[in-house]
């Protein structure tokens, strides 16, 4: 437990800082552009992380929203109830996960449709010999073809959105203070460590996507969708009255809103 508490203390000193929330979006954009430039001008040699079958990609990134949802659900519930003691407010705040799920579903559906309507089925990865009889990606793959369309990076979108959402929700830790005797201490400490590790995985795999996969325009659109999803909720909608609301803070709502304008 002592090692867990030390790890939690370290994460409180990094991910919970206001500067992290302010500059992480810019850091993601910069790393995406730098990684894409590196990929085009001086590609890195193949590595374990460039293999789509690597453990982090298969068991984490492929189900990134499920991991984020399942860890944020108890974290938001416990921390918000600890601070407010109001079940209604907790349920209201948990609706952020429903909003996030809707955003994930709508955006991935848009990406899939764009790839479908801009794509064609080819006989080889070199995009030779168009197979006009195959009208969908699924049908194309079933017949041994290769579908090529404008494939907006779902990884860039989802990893951006998930990382920023976790960092926003962890800002509540400025107000959460529990000692070892508190009934929620172990649960909250464990969730903080788990969410911190998850955030670092999302950022790492975002960098891998920038360096190894997709072209620049596909990653730009994916990252842009992630940033707009984050800012549209936490920066624009959630500070308003009729919304799931922001994580509880002792400071006024106006101060929270001002932090997005700096």
Curated annotation (Swiss-Prot):
Disulfide-bonded cysteines: none
Keyword Hydrolase: yes
Annotated function: Fatty acyl-coenzyme A (CoA) diphosphatase that hydrolyzes fatty acyl-CoA to yield acyl-4'-phosphopantetheine and adenosine 3',5'-bisphosphate. Preferentially hydrolyzes unsaturated long-chain acyl-CoA substrates such as oleoyl-CoA/(9Z)-octadecenoyl-CoA and arachidonoyl-CoA/(5Z,8Z,11Z,14Z)-eicosatetraenoyl-CoA in the endoplasmic reticulum (ER) lumen. This catalytic activity is required for maintaining ER structure and for lipid droplets (LDs) biogenesis, which are lipid storage organelles involved in maintaining lipid and energy homeostasis.
Annotated Gene Ontology cellular component terms: endoplasmic reticulum membrane
Gene Ontology MF annotations: coenzyme A diphosphatase activity; diacylglycerol binding; triglyceride binding
Residues on Lumenal side: 45-57, 115-145, 212-218
Transmembrane segments: 24-44, 58-78, 94-114, 146-166, 191-211, 219-239
Catalytic activity: an acyl-CoA + H2O = an acyl-4'-phosphopantetheine + adenosine 3',5'-bisphosphate + 2 H(+); (9Z)-octadecenoyl-CoA + H2O = S-(9Z-octadecenoyl)-4'-phosphopantetheine + adenosine 3',5'-bisphosphate + 2 H(+); (5Z,8Z,11Z,14Z)-eicosatetraenoyl-CoA + H2O = S-(5Z,8Z,11Z,14Z-eicosatetraenoyl)-4'-phosphopantetheine + adenosine 3',5'-bisphosphate + 2 H(+); hexadecanoyl-CoA + H2O = S-hexadecanoyl-4'-phosphopantetheine + adenosine 3',5'-bisphosphate + 2 H(+)
Similarity-based family: Belongs to the FIT family. FIT2 subfamily.
Encoding gene, per UniProt annotation: FITM2
Swiss-Prot/TrEMBL keywords: Deafness, Disease variant, Dystonia, Endoplasmic reticulum, Hydrolase, Intellectual disability, Lipid metabolism, Membrane, Transmembrane, Transmembrane helix
UniProt disease link: Siddiqi syndrome: An autosomal recessive disorder characterized by early-onset progressive sensorineural hearing impairment, global developmental delay, regression of motor skills, dystonia, and low body mass index. Some patients have an ichthosis-like appearance of the skin and signs of sensory neuropathy.
Chief location bin: endoplasmic reticulum
UniProt-listed GO biological process terms: cytoskeleton organization; fat cell differentiation; fatty-acyl-CoA catabolic process; intracellular triglyceride homeostasis; lipid droplet formation; lipid droplet organization; lipid homeostasis; lipid storage
Cytoplasmic side of membrane: 1-23, 79-93, 167-190, 240-262
Enzyme class: hydrolase
Expression sites by tissue: Widely expressed.
Record protein name field: Acyl-coenzyme A diphosphatase FITM2
Active site: residue positions: 155, 214
Subcellular location, record wording: Endoplasmic reticulum membrane
Record EC number: 3.6.1.-
Species for this entry: Homo sapiens
Pfam families linked to this entry: FIT
InterPro entries: FIT, FITM1/2
Taxonomic lineage of the native organism: Eukaryota, Metazoa, Chordata, Craniata, Vertebrata
Topology versus the membrane: Multi-pass membrane protein
């Amino acid at each position: 437990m002592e090692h867990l508490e030390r790890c939690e203390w370290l994460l409180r000193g990094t991910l919970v800082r206001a500067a992290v929330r302010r500059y992480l979006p810019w850091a993601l954009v910069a790393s995406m552009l730098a990684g894409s430039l590196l990929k085009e001008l001086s590609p890195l040699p193949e590595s374990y992380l460039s293999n789509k079958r690597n453990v982090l990609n298969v068991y984490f990134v492929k189900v990134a929203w499920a991991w984020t949802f399942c860890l944020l659900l108890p974290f938001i519930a416990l921390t918000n109830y600890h601070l407010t003691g109001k079940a209604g407010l907790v349920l209201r705040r948990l609706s952020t996960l429903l909003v996030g799920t809707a955003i994930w579903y709508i955006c991935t559906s848009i990406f899939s449709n764009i790839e479908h309507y801009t794509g064609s089925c080819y006989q080889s990865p070199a995009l030779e010999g168009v197979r006009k009889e195959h009208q969908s990606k699924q049908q194309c793959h079933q017949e041994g073809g290769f579908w090529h369309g404008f494939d907006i990076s779902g990884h860039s979108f989802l990893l951006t959105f998930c990382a920023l959402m976790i960092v926003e929700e962890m800002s509540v830790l400025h107000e959460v203070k529990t000692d070892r005797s508190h009934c929620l201490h172990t649960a909250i400490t464990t969730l903080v460590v788990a969410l911190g590790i998850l955030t670092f995985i999302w950022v790492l795999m975002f960098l891998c996507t920038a360096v190894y996969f997709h072209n620049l325009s596909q990653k730009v659109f994916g990252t842009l969708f992630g940033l707009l999803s984050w800012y549209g909720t936490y920066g624009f909608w959630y500070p308003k009255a009729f919304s799931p609301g922001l994580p509880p803070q002792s400071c006024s709502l106006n101060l929270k809103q001002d932090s997005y304008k700096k």
